[in-house]
Each structure stands twice: as structure tokens, then as C-alpha cells.
Amino acid sequence: MTTRQRIYVAIAIITLIGLGNVLAQTQFKDQRSRAPRQHHNVALPTTAATQFGDPLADLTPTQLADFAAGLDEFQSVDTAESGLGPVFNNVSCVACHSDPAIGGGSVIHETRFGRIANGHFDPLAELGGSLMQDFAIDPTAQEVVPAQANVVAKRKSTPLFGLGLIEAIPDSAILQNAQNPKPDGITGRPSIVQDVATGHTRIGRFGWKAQQATLLAFAGDAYLNEIGITSRLFPQENAPRGDLYMLELYDHVADPEDAVDPATGKADIDRFADFMRYLAPPPRASLTQSAIAGAAVFLQTGCENCHRALMQTSSSTIRALDRKLVPLFSDLLLHDMGSLGDGIAQGTAAPAEMKTAPLWGLRARTPLLHDGRAPTIDAAIRLHDGEAAKVRDRYTRLNSAQQQQLLDFLKSI
């Protein structure tokens, strides 16, 4: 990146985090029955989100109603009678996505396992892998990590704020990120997936491994694998421990369990996608002089080589998503993270590869990293490896004041 480009990115970062004026002056587990909906009155905002969980600005009344209906569905509780299980990780979406507001992440982890032998990853699908569900509708169906597994990984639930904007970023922009030359041995490659929602080959961008390309596919994947509800996109139930007898014994609801409501033409997964699509990105925190200085350190250290500050959505019939700048701080590419990888192959991602996590709202999601191993931002940086090793080392060589400036900046975005 040239000096001119670095200055441009720095100015863009500062402008996006609301510093134009400053710069001018300075340089689970409740298994109750499926609850009746509570309808939420959501005020249509006229400016950017002011708190976590707000809807996007510029939504139409119809879009805002879809957001509210999606929010209700997101909080609904499933039971065995409605299709829950036979194995599952929780009974509702909100159970794992509530911090610091509905649509956020949580400290709840899911367990992934597999076996690596002779350089090949086996998800042990015949034993229920690679995802182990923590709960079952009957104890005899309970899953465990099989003895054959030699890789076990934990993954936190991810925050959903701003995902509509990320969905609206064109594939071409992500491909361009991969093609742009990068220093420090950083490469990065797009996750090319078959999108079950459209049937098209797309660039994945959702999930720790960028394994889904659209919010509808992301919703359907989670509804099946986290709650055990089949849908038109994912119609095949998970067999407990891969045992088809157990599946026949405990799965009594006809598939797909997520049926389309004839009154609205929408199934639950459509409502989940509406909620995520119209959920605003994290609000910006107030800025300090230290955070302003930290923007420059962010660039100088090389963080922006992967955590790209800005991308832009393509044209859209949805005004709130139409040609918007997206300060996500991610290139949405897969990178070989060395020891920081989780050891699980998924989609097109190799065991050591992880998607660059967007940094917006970072201050609200400790502990950090995919498995929550880092209690602080500083610890998370120091645990970077693989392609990020040189940038990590550059950070460790900063003096304490520069490190604090960078940390203050990261807490502000």
C-alpha cells in the first residue's frame, strides 16, 4: 500500500468512526412450550444506529415490520412437538445470540470434532460429526465426542449485527481483496461455495469458515445444526451419533419441519434472514485522542492488510443497503492462521484456515477469538499466527503507549 493509499484509508477510518470534527480541530435452556409472539414496536431510526440491536436506518414501514416479525421469530422457543432435535445445541436463536443485545453473540460454545490422518481431515460424519450437539430430546440419543476423533475444537456464536450490509457486498469486491498484493507473506483466498438458497456458485462470507454465502442459507444451516429443525434448504435431519435407528426412534415430525406460513409465504428461516438483513451494524463508541492516534498505528502495524477497514455494497432495491460504505474491518477472505486455526475443515476451508473476523463491535464480545481463548484484545493479537505472524510480531515490538493507542482504537470501532 502506498503512502497516499494509507493516508486515504486512515482518513476513511476516522471519518467512519465519527471523527471528522475532531480531526479538524486536532490532527439457554428453558424448554417451555413455544411461547406466543410478543410484537415489538420498533421506532424507525432516521440516523445511524445508536445502540446494539437497532434496525438499519432508512427502512421502509414494510421492511421495519419484517424486521419486527423476524425479531419475534428469533426469540421463539422450539419443542420436540414443533421439531426440536432429536439432537440440538439450544432451543431458540436468541439463546446463543443475546450479548450485548438480541442479535449479538454469547460465551456459549459449540463443539466440533474430526480426525486428521496422513494430512487428510475426516469429519467422522458416520459418527455424527463434525458438529457435536450438546443436548438431545432423550438421554439415549445424547452425543459424545467419539474416541476416533483426534481434533476437538470449540466455537463461539458470532454476533449478527450488520450482516445485511455484508451480504450486500458484491462477490467481485471480495475477489478483488484476494487479488490485491499484500505484504508480510499474507495471501488470503475467497471461500467459493455452492449457495443452497440460490443454487449458484457464490463467495462465502458467513460463519467462522465463511461456509455460507447468503443469510437465508446461513439461517437454514443454523436452524438444522443448532436447533434440529429441517427446512426446505436443509431437509435431512441429523442422526444422533450418525445412528439412523436413533433418528427413526425420536424424529416424529414430518420434514421439512419449518413449513411455509401460507398467510405470509414465509417460513421461519425467511424471518430469521429478514431480522439479520435489517439489523444495523454495531454503533460506534466515543473517541479519545488515544484512539485517534491508534488508527495510524493500526495501519503502520499492518492490521489493515487483512482487517480491511472499508468495503461497499452494490446497488440494491433496498435503500438501506444501496451502495453503502461498510466499515466492517475484514476482507472476508480465508487465511492460514497456523496455530490459531481450529483444525476443522469445513466448506472449502482447510483446518488451519479461518475467515478474517470483522472487528466492528469488538469491544462487546469478549472473550475473543473463535474459541474464546483470549480474555483481552491484547491477548487476541498475541495469539495470531500463520499469515498474521509478522504483523503480530510488529505489534509486540511497539512501545506500551503505541500498543494502548491501538487497543483504544479497536475498542472504538
Regions found by a protein language model. Give the residues of each.
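Bacterial N-terminal signal peptides
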Residues: 10-18
